């Protein structure tokens, strides 16, 4: 029943890909197939379902901000992280500099927009970009159970070449004391983090680990305290879908995080993790058909947490 349901939802939502565009500001992302669409569901009871282009690889992009936030909290405690990054929603686009200047004592509004994510990466322990990215990769491999996860070198170089907006955000934060480390090293780790290559299954596994409050459903091993998982899910609800987070909470009601690579990670507490992929994006930078799939799924299975 679940299998046929997700297959029909995928087909039903495929038409929406025509209304979106693949990300073009990072040249490598332009190469994505606009019509691709896939889903993977990892239920906490051990059942797994998938449909469409669920095994297509794509770069994690902003979904990695969840992982960076978890590691930063584990390294520093929540209080220290909150002294550098807020947890308030933003009405501006994900790469905006506006709020850094006019709000919040120069502190980025939240860890899910670029400025906040760069500040978060700067808090991860490690003396070099290599050390930091290795810790992020190690964590991602552990949680997904996929030892082959790695950085896509072409996308990383492409991000680095076109990352001037992110550089300006980072140097501004260095100037205001939010970032204490060497800016170029922090940015290098950030660009690599965004270029980690995953599939729907990988992000569904991260989502189910969060749905299970920090315990790996497959082994029963606790990776992070339940409290940290809860904090991350709360931030996902308020800030995870960029400046469309409010309408997404109303229509879908599932803690989620999107990325401009076309992925959306959605975590239904106590029930399941969902990974969706569709590189055609809406104006806010979210997968246009991916959002529709989650709307339909939430409606049909009554998944809203509200």
UniProtKB/Swiss-Prot annotation:
What keywords were assigned to this record?
A: Hydrolase
First-tier enzyme category under EC: hydrolase
One short Pfam family name for this protein? Glutaminase
Which reaction(s) does its UniProt entry say it catalyses?
Answer: L-glutamine + H2O = L-glutamate + NH4(+)
Tell me which EC number(s) this protein carries: 3.5.1.2
Which N-terminal residues, if any, form the signal peptide?
Answer: none
Q: Which residues bind substrate?
A: 62, 114, 159, 166, 190, 242, 260
Annotated membrane-spanning segments are none
An example GO biological process term is: glutamate biosynthetic process
Q: Name one GO molecular function term.
A: glutaminase activity
Q: Does the keyword Electron transport apply?
A: no
Asked if the record carries the keyword Hydrolase, the reply is yes
Q: State the superkingdom.
A: Bacteria
UniProt subunit comment: Homotetramer.
HAMAP family linked to this entry:
Glutaminase
Sequence similarity: Belongs to the glutaminase family.
Protein name per the record: Glutaminase
Q: Which organism is it from?
A: Clostridium tetani (strain Massachusetts / E88)
The taxonomic lineage of its organism, from the top, reads: Bacteria, Bacillati, Bacillota, Clostridia, Eubacteriales
């Amino acid at each position: 029943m679940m299998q046929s349901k997700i297959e029909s939802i995928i087909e039903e939502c495929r038409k929406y890909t025509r209304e979106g565009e693949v990300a073009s500001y990072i040249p490598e992302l332009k190469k994505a197939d606009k019509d691709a669409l896939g889903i993977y569901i990892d239920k906490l009871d051990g059942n797994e379902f998938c449909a469409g282009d669920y095994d297509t690889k794509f770069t994690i992009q902003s979904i990695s901000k969840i992982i960076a936030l978890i590691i930063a909290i584990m390294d520093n405690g929540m209080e220290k992280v909150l002294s550098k990054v807020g947890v308030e929603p933003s009405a501006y686009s994900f790469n905006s500099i506006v709020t850094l200047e006019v709000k919040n004592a120069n502190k980025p509004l939240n860890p899910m927009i670029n400025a906040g994510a760069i500040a978060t990466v700067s808090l991860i322990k490690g003396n070099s970009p290599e050390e930091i990215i290795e810790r992020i990769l190690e964590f991602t491999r552990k949680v997904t159970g996929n030892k082959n996860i790695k950085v896509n070198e072409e996308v990383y170089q492409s991000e680095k070449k076109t990352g001037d907006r992110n550089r300006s955000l980072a140097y501004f934060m260095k100037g205001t004391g939010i970032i204490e480390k060497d800016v170029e090293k922090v940015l290098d780790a950030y660009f690599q983090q965004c270029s980690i290559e995953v599939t729907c299954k990988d992000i569904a596994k991260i989502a189910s680990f969060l749905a299970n409050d920090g315990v790996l459903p497959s082994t029963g091993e606790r990776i992070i305290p339940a409290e940290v998982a809860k904090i991350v899910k709360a931030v996902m609800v308020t800030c995870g879908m960029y400046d469309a987070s409010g309408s997404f909470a109303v229509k879908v009601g599932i803690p989620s995080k999107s990325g401009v690579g076309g992925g959306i990670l959605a975590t239904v507490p106590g029930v399941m993790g969902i990974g969706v992929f569709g590189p055609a994006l809406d104006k806010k930078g979210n997968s246009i058909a991916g959002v529709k799939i989650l709307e339909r799924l939430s409606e049909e299975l009554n998944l809203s947490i509200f």
